Amino acid sequence: HWPLLAPSPYHKMYNQSDVIGVVKDEVEKKNPHPVFSAFQQLEYSQNYTDEKKRRHVIPTYMGLISEIDHHIGRLISFLDTNNLSENTVIIFTSDHGDYLGDHWLGEKDLFHEPSIRIPLIIVDPNMPKNLRGSSERRMVESVDIVPTIVETMGGSYASNRMEGPSILLLA
């Protein structure tokens, strides 16, 4: 979210040459649905569709992601150092992605890939070795996380009381 401010050294890790192009087409602006048009007119969408602003801001966004990676590494090092890794399940996710100018939009508003495809990383020391480091392309939702935690911890839940299924079934 704006303002994108990254502390040192992350604010200088990337530069404008690291920014990839946007996914957008003039067709998306010609006769858009009124809702789509309204989101395109929002200030943050306008900021991301200004290529000069976009190329200035996205390296900071990338730096913030690197900062998160660094702190996840610190957490894992702490768990390893204190012999807690074998008894700790780590779940890392985000609430939404960001358009970063794709489809003439900024932030999260609608349901294109940049907005809905988010990281979901699960590190479970009890996971079978053949599944470690694997990637899953099937869609899961945030509501699937709580049932997954309950099942991972050996508990049970009434499926009519929780909206999502455990994603352990995907394994």
Where are these regions (language model features)?
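Short, intrinsically disordered, charge-balanced linker/junction segments flanking boundaries
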Residues: G164-A171
